Amino acid sequence: MGKFSDIVKSDTPTLVDFYATWCGPCKMMSPVLDRLKDEMGSQVRVLKIDVDKNPDVSDKFKIRGVPTFILFKKGEIVWRQSGGMDINTLKNKIKQAL
């Protein structure tokens, strides 16, 4: 949990994708997140957390459905949403946090 805390405390916005390997919508979001990383580069950090392998982190943030996205900046949650979404929604939320 220490490394996770260090990452989300960064000045760079960090988008955390809480997902599961068995989740269909999570699989559909993978190429969207890859494209987001390509298009936004160093403006954002994307971190994927497998809820089944990391139940402690999932419990801490009360993850009840996947995918759930939480955007952190300087350790604070600035946005949170569950379910699949398009790249423009993600980009807009990240730009608001810059």
Model-derived features: positions:
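Short pre-active-site segment immediately N-terminal to redox-active cysteine/selenocysteine motifs
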Residues: 11-12, 19-22, 65
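Hydrophobic beta-strand anchors of alpha/beta hydrolase catalytic cores
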Residues: 15-16, 46, 69
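A short beta-strand-turn-helix
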Residues: 1-13, 55
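Non-catalytic, surface beta->alpha helical segment in thiol-disulfide oxidoreductase systems
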Residues: 73-98
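The canonical Cys-X-X-Cys-His
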Residues: 23-26, 69
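Structural microenvironment flanking redox-active thiols in thiol-disulfide oxidoreductases
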Residues: 51-57
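Typically the conserved alpha-helix immediately C-terminal to a functionally engaged Cys/Sec
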Residues: 27-40
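A short, hydrophobic beta-strand/beta-hairpin element that forms part of a small beta-sheet core
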Residues: 33, 67-78
